[in-house]
Amino acid sequence: VANVEKNLQNALKTVKAESESGSSLIVFPELYLTAYTCGDLFLQDALIQSALDALIKFSKETAYSDAVIVGLPIKKGGELYNCAAVLQSGAILGIVPKTYIPNYNEYYEKRWFASSEKVNCSSVIIDDEEVPFGSNLLFTLSSGAVLGVEICEDLWVPVPPSSELCLNGADI
């Protein structure tokens, strides 16, 4: 938990092994780079910056892979978002923030994270590059497949984001 460097190293090993075995899409869990269970550590700027630095390094060091999705927290406009970063060939293709933030039973993500519904921009700057940012992004993979992304609770609602993503052309 909160050991971003260790999580990064494990992710790099996984991508190498999976790429060598022929995987064309590698997906890591929600908030993988920090771990999901950081609690109030998500309020620490050092953790958020460490995750962003790890994402930049991860994208560069996995340039040989087809497509990778990894979870991390991203701060934008004074809000913190639970996001999935889509990487391909060394580039960060886009950042998808979670839309439905659970706040019941053992889930209390609203303590730390904002919904993508609060997003009032279409991009973020990462490593001096403008990167698309939004819950409605579609990504065309090298195979030609079109990918849409939703995160955990997003799938559990009556009309999940994937419904609109599919209507707009997502295959995966």
Regions found by a protein language model. Name each.
Residues V1-I172:
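Enzyme catalytic cores with a strong preference for nitrogen-chemistry domains
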